[in-house]
Regions:
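Feature captures the catalytic ectodomains and active-site-proximal regions of enzymes
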Residues: 1-385
Length: 385
């Protein structure tokens, strides 16, 4: 009997373009394969053991004869390709009415709302990665004290202010108010408060990031687990991506290794329910991304050795982020899924699954909660024999 599920979602863990990726300009996206090619191969022995080499050909990764985990890949049926859409679908909510708000930048009407609430003129309003926005607008920001604003070209806008110019609490509150005002105006968008530190030309993200998001438009696995009396713990930005709904408690740590440490620590404190962690392992430079991914792989045995008989571990992603492509933005890709447990089957090919909502259905079935409206559980495939 499964008593506890550990769900690790790696931000940007793509493994090849989805059939509709061309509509998003992502038909060439293949995050992990291109990363491996760029750095001369990846050393991921623990993901390799779980079955990574069976999901896709990756330089440096072998296809094991007897994988220790079950493996497959997940597609996404929702429109969009950002973290909100990805995590909502992983939780059992497919969004088909999503309108891309910031395809050409943040619209003027939205900018008027944002600048009214911030109380200052902003600079930027470009489609960019964080590193690019901070590099290009950092010197002007330090000189003018104007907040930097940018978008992912989808449905997220980021607001960055140096810690010496606005307190983290003030920045978070203003972004919370922006999200509410835009929601009241009928705009569904994620607003990210990102404090920064450093000197002109070398600004970098600091602690205190918060993501302000509307609640999911449907029933999630968190809702039904909460309703059934299960404990639901959020680590990283998981809590923010659901506007807190359905979580018992959250720990807003954004360093991937700190988040992983939090999960390890909870194994001794949380006896049942769901531990849901987000891990950002794809910084915007190829060598740093490969280093982060390999460091995560080396830490997996620390998790596995602490598992109990009734534990189930699921490792997957929320979208791709092919750093070899221009822009270094989220990409429309399949994500791998790996499942392991001390007492369940090994080496089962879970196949190519149409929707990431299958993860949610598996989690609620494993923890004996009510069935969700969408998704097919793969729990039966995990049973030994």
């Amino acid at each position: 009997m499964i008593n506890r599920v550990i769900l690790l979602v790696i931000d940007g863990f793509g493994i090849g373009a989805l059939p509709d990726a061309g509509a998003y300009g992502d038909d060439q996206a293949d995050t992990i394969r291109h990363l491996a090619d760029a750095v001369g191969g990846l050393s991921l022995p623990n993901l390799e053991s779980l079955g990574l080499g069976h999901v896709a050909p990756i330089k440096g990764v072998r296809s094991m004869a007897q994988p220790s985990g079950c493996f497959g890949r997940l597609g996404f049926s929702s429109r969009g390709k950002d973290s909100v859409v990805g995590h909502w679908e992983l939780s059992g909510v497919i969004v088909n009415d999503e309108t891309t708000v910031c395809r050409s930048g943040i619209p003027a009407a939205m900018m008027a709302v944002i600048e009214r609430i911030v109380g200052r003129k902003t600079i930027g309003n470009t489609i960019a990665s964080m590193a690019t926005a901070l590099r290009e607008y950092g010197p002007s920001h330090v000189t003018t004290k104007s907040p930097i604003i940018w978008t992912d070209g989808d449905n997220t806008c980021f607001l960055a202010v140096h810690e010496t110019m606005m307190s983290t609490a003030d920045l978070q509150q203003r972004c919370r108010e922006i999200r509410k005002a835009l929601k009241d105006a009928g705009v569904r968008i994620r607003v990210v408060a990102q404090p920064v530190t450093g000197e002109p030309g070398a600004l970098q993200a600091s602690k205190g990031r918060r993501d302000f998001v509307s609640e999911p438009p449907g029933l999630t696995m968190l809702d039904v687990l909460n309703r059934s009396g299960q404990i639901t713990m959020g680590i990283g930005k998981a809590y923010d991506l659901f506007s807190g709904r359905g979580f018992t408690k959250s720990f807003a740590v954004y360093s991937p290794m700190a988040a992983f440490d939090e999960v390890i620590g909870m194994l001794n404190k949380v006896p049942r329910g769901l531990l849901y962690a987000t891990l950002d392992l794809f910084p915007e430079e190829l060598t740093r991304a490969s280093t982060a991914l390999e460091a995560f792989d080396r830490r997996l045995p620390d998790l596995f050795e602490k598992l109990r008989v009734g534990d189930l571990v699921i490792v997957t992603g929320d979208h791709g982020r092919d750093l070899s492509l221009p822009g270094k933005m989220p990409t429309r890709e399949y994500v791998p899924v790996f499942v392991t447990s001390p007492k369940l089957a090994q080496g089962v090919d879970l196949g190519s699954r149409q929707t990431a909502a299958d993860v949610a259905q598996t989690v609620v079935e494993a923890l004996r909660a009510e069935r969700l409206p969408v998704g097919d559980s793969f729990l039966d495939a995990l049973r030994p024999g």
